[in-house]
Regions:
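Helix N-cap at the start of a conserved alpha-helix in ABC-type nucleotide-binding domains
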Residues: 143-145
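The feature captures the beta-strand-to-loop junction immediately N-terminal to the Walker
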Residues: 36-38
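Conserved structural motif at the start of ABC-family nucleotide-binding domains
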Residues: 5, 20-22
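Helix-to-loop junction immediately C-terminal to a conserved catalytic motif
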Residues: 51
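Hydrophobic anchor residue at the start of the ABC signature
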Residues: 121
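Catalytic Walker B motif of ABC-type/P-loop ATPase nucleotide-binding domains
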Residues: 132-136
């Protein structure tokens, strides 16, 4: 079966510093994959390269499905309301109008970190991508929002999608079908 996303010899350098050693990985339909490692191990860099937000210094990423990405630091327009952010990103990405969600009508910059994370995740789900790349997706969510996210991710998996999420949380890691571990920019066997 063709993977939904595959990295072949993907690496990333900043000048002379290698932050991600060449690595290979595949995300297949129906998979929930945890990406773990200490702070600074390269998890965010790897997810950014897989999503196409950063170009790899070497290797290539093959995507046979649409990809949604929720970075650890969301790129939101603070002066826009959450609804305006959703509509803007939907237009930029060529998706139909974003679903009407129960969102506050105040500028995003005035919202809590948890509320901004909810918006960040809503942006990742725009267009119903088959692959989701989520960087510490539950870090700022309250327990009720965490439970809703895990329910939604289970539906993505059941529909034949793939999810790769970075986490430091042992309980979340246990939800995964498999775990990828990074240490000092190297994907461990």
């Amino acid at each position: 079966m063709t993977p939904l996303l595959a990295a072949r010899g993907v690496s990333r350098r900043y000048g002379d510093r290698e932050v991600l050693a060449p690595c290979d990985l595949e995300l297949r339909a129906g998979e929930l994959v945890a990406l773990v490692g200490p702070n600074g191990s390269g998890k965010s860099t790897l997810l950014s390269v897989l999503a196409g937000a950063l170009d790899p210094s070497g290797g290539q990423v093959e995507r046979s499905a649409t990809v949604g990405w929720a970075p650890q630091r969301p790129a939101l327009y603070g002066r826009l309301t959450p609804r305006e952010n959703l509509r803007l990103f939907a237009r930029l990405e060529g998706h139909p109008a974003a679903a009407e969600l129960d969102l506050p009508e105040t500028p995003t910059v005035t919202h809590s970190v948890g509320m901004r994370q909810r918006l960040n995740l809503a942006l990742a789900f725009l267009g119903e991508p088959r692959v989701l790349l989520l960087d510490e997706p539950t870090a700022s969510l309250d327990p009720a929002q965490r439970a809703l996210l895990w329910e939604r991710l289970a539906r993505v998996r059941e529909a034949g999608g793939a999810v790769c999420f970075a986490t430091q949380n042992v309980e979340e890691r246990e939800r995964a079908d498999r775990t990828l571990e990074l240490l000092d920019g190297r994907l461990l066997p």
